[in-house]
Amino acid sequence: MFEVRKIFDRTEGDVRLTAFETCGQVCSRQIDIETDGEVIKQVRYTGGCNGNTQGVAALVAGMKIDEAIARLEGIDCNGRGTSCPDQLARALKQL
């Protein structure tokens, strides 16, 4: 119900670039993720609360994927059952 959908996946050298469409229950529409092995290099949200999504992206940069999932999974936004951070955790689980 709240799952993200992978829409793009490419590897350039050691860097994996992956894009996900969010579930439609959150303000952001897309999440672009760059990883190097098990480490998140960069996250970019399309749509959503600009300050909050930039904050989440800055906090997870340099973090291991498993740690980010553990910290973000299950965060709820206004009773929606998911949130932009939770959508990122769901996307990271698909990597």
Feature-to-residue mapping (PLM):
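Structured beta-strand/loop patches that form or line metal/cofactor-binding pockets in enzymes
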Residues: M1-G37
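Active-site- and interface-proximal helix/loop "cap" or "latch" segments in soluble metabolic
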Residues: T22-L95
